[in-house]
């Protein structure tokens, strides 16, 4: 992003034209950065709770007092329960190294990101098949001939480069297929749209695999070279015909067959996107895995216009940024969430936050008593917030580090206000890509209020807890530490904000692909899964259908908001001030509901009101809302009481998760809808 500033105020914001695919574009959230900075309702100074949790009574304090208080509480937790009693979660991203180093320096293994409520299934699915993480392959949209979006809504859940690259591809003749329970904005741009029954995606994908194999439409030469256990896949898929899938999905066998034939014509430059937010159903892991299998059968892995392996910094003969985590030994303690030991098929790195919360509740395998939520709002992002509050009541310390009010901050003991991104600088970042690069974020403005950057907050805590290696006074010293040995200096970022590490994009040699599996191939049968008693190829089980008068509650994103973080932003509020309930027109007619009517949604005694959007373009089994609304904090005058919060209808869902992929199953709740 480029910010034009005059007299201490933002004049104009645009995308960085030097960043790949940006073309100076910004999404609505990016443009609304000016409104965020100018918002008087955002957090303005550190706060310490002065009443019961969630009561909204606060004592405004100095940074010295806030950091002293937090450090004393953390030290007390370490003294009584050990360093493993401290946990920290975030929303991921490229700037995590410093606060992860802080946690490691204390001696705790309990770092989690939000991914068990987002993309953990797709990550583990790729690992189980290719040994690669979800970010180890690129989506080469710009060169693709056919793109399939099933668990991804590119044109509403926006990454600007993806939108621009896919738009360019469509302009150049690329075909787009969308599979969804509703007609999203992405569906309006599609050549083919399949309106699928909620939860039946796996059936559709198995039928595609069946057709590719049964009719020899797959890339045989590629499969012979790179795919292991193909015979097992053929035997498994034999029963899952398009005719069988028609009864499960509501999509005709003939349409499935024609679609598969079209895919085969465009291989290997095909991208069947494996998904982004895949914490939806109890079989979402296998939906994601089946997508990766289809990509493998089409030869898309490693292909231009498909899923080429990204280049990491070392792959292009350069040295990566030095990390602060390397300053401290890896904690020997087992993770509280069980990732890597109780569940050896799960990657340890970002953990599984819902299982961390279970450990807070049960005190097993040991007590977790202090929790820092950094740019993370689990009370909005995870199901059943009332249950989660009961779990948080077991904590001795709950700290929220956030740039704006959120439910978790409102329930916290300490709130440490983070400067908005235009008012803070961050660590240098690395982008692994076809052409990898380093990038920098500098502050465009000095903070309006008494807020701080993340490095300032964690440096302050580190200094108080004896972690002198993290006690920095300037961001320049941090940047210089990171750049040691890279051959790059700070001045190299001045003109463009990034430093390319290779002279051009580098595609892998498709004749010499390497996969990070024991065999070096794509393994249909995963030993890690099988050793845990989990099938690599899971037989299909028909998803539950709603009872009479019920609907499966589904949710997603829109282009105007980022989860619940932006709903109180004045500029974005003016674009979209509340969510609405999508409901099928024929189902609405049965209930006497017309478009725009206020309806009551209910489940297990909990009800909320919302306006109905009556449309033929949603499957009759489901209803849909945009996630992030239904705010109840009086400090948010615009967001307060607007729309419905989907996660409050997911009572009991903290215990609903996919044992193969590790992520939550957030679309396994059924609700009633009535007029009024």
Residue ranges of each PLM-predicted region?
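N-terminal export/assembly segments and adjacent metallocofactor-ligating motifs
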Residues: 1-215, 239, 252, 589, ...
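N-terminal leader/propeptide and maturation segments of large enzyme subunits in energy/redox metabolism
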Residues: 48-65, 215-253, 372, 443-516, ...
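Flexible glycine/proline-enriched surface loops and loop-helix/loop-strand junctions
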Residues: 52, 150, 189-190, 239-244, ...
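Flexible, glycine/charged-enriched surface loops at secondary-structure junctions
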Residues: 81-85, 218-223, 269-271, 302-309, ...
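Conserved short loop/turn motifs at secondary-structure junctions
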Residues: 85-94, 248-251, 275-282, 313-315, ...
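Extended redox/cofactor-interaction regions of prokaryotic respiratory oxidoreductases
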Residues: 99-168, 172-179, 202-206, 292-410, ...
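Flexible glycine/proline-rich, aromatic-decorated loop/lid segments
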Residues: 185, 406-441
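Long, contiguous, secondary-structure-rich segments that constitute the structural scaffold
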Residues: 444, 448, 452-502, 571-581, ...
């Amino acid at each position: 992003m480029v910010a034009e500033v005059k007299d201490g105020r933002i004049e104009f914001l645009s995308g960085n034209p030097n960043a790949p695919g940006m073309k100076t574009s910004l999404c609505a959230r990016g443009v609304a950065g000016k409104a965020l900075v100018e918002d008087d309702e955002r957090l303005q100074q550190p706060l310490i709770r002065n009443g019961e949790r969630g009561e909204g009574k606060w004592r405004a304090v100095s940074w010295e007092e806030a950091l002293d208080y937090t450090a004393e509480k953390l030290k007390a937790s370490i003294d009584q329960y050990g360093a493993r009693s401290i946990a920290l979660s975030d929303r991921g991203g490229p700037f995590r190294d410093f606060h992860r180093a802080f946690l490691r320096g204390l001696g705790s293994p309990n770092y989690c990101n939000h991914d068990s409520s987002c993309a953990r299934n797709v990550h583990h699915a790729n690992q189980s098949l290719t040994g690669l993480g979800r970010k180890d392959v690129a989506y080469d949209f710009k060169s693709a001939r056919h793109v399939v979006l099933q668990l991804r809504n590119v044109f509403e859940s926006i990454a600007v480069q993806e939108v621009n690259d896919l738009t360019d591809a469509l302009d150049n003749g690329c075909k787009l297929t969308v599979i969804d329970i509703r007609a999203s904005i992405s569906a309006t741009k599609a050549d083919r749209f399949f309106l699928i029954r909620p939860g039946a995606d796996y059936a559709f994908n198995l039928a595609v695999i069946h057709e590719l194999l049964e009719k020899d439409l797959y890339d045989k030469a590629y499969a012979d070279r790179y795919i292991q256990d193909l015979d097992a896949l053929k035997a498994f898929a034999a029963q899952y015909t398009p005719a069988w899938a028609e009864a499960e999905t509501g999509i005709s066998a003939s349409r499935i067959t024609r679609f598969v034939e079209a895919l085969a014509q465009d291989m290997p430059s095909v991208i069947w996107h494996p998904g982004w937010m895949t914490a939806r159903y109890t079989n979402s892991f296998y939906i994601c895995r089946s997508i990766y299998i289809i990509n493998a059968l089409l030869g898309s892995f490693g292909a231009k216009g498909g899923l080429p392996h990204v280049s990491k910094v070392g792959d292009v003969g350069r040295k990566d940024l030095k990390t602060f985590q390397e300053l401290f030994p890896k904690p020997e303690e087992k993770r509280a969430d069980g990732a890597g030991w109780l569940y050896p098929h799960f990657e340890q790195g970002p953990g599984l936050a819902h299982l961390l919360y279970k450990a807070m509740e049960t005190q097993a395998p040991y007590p977790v008593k202090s929790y820092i939520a950094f740019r993370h709002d689990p009370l909005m992002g995870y199901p059943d917030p009332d249950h989660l509050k009961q779990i948080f009541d077991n904590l001795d310390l709950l700290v929220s580090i956030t740039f704006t009010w959120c439910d978790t901050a409102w329930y916290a003991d300490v709130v440490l206000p983070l400067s908005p991104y235009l008012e803070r600088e961050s660590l240098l970042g690395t982008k692994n890509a076809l052409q990898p690069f380093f990038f920098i974020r500098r502050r465009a403005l000095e903070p309006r209020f008494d807020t701080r950057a993340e490095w300032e907050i964690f440096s302050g805590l580190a200094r108080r807890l004896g972690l002198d290696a993290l006690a920095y006074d300037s961001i320049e010293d941090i940047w210089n530490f990171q750049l040691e040995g890279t051959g790059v200096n700070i001045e190299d970022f001045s003109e463009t904000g990034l430093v390319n590490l290779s002279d051009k994009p580098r595609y892998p040699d498709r004749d010499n692909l390497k996969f990070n599996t024991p065999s070096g191939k794509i393994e249909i049968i995963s030993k890690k899964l099988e050793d845990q008693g989990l099938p690599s190829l899971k037989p299909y089980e028909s998803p539950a259908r709603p009872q009479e008068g019920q609907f499966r509650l589904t949710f997603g994103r829109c282009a105007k908001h980022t989860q619940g973080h932006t709903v109180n932003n004045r500029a974005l509020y003016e674009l979209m001030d509340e969510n609405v309930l999508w409901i099928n027109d024929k189902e609405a007619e049965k209930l006497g509901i017309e478009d725009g009517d206020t309806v009551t949604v209910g489940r297990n005694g909990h009800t909320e009101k919302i306006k109905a959007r009556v449309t033929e373009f949603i499957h009759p089994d489901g209803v849909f809302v945009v996630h992030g609304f239904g705010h109840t904090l009086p400090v948010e005058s615009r967001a307060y009481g607007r729309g419905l919060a989907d996660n409050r209808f997911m009572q009991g869902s903290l215990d609903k998760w996919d044992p193969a992929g590790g992520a939550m199953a957030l679309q396994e709740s059924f609700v009633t809808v009535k007029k009024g």
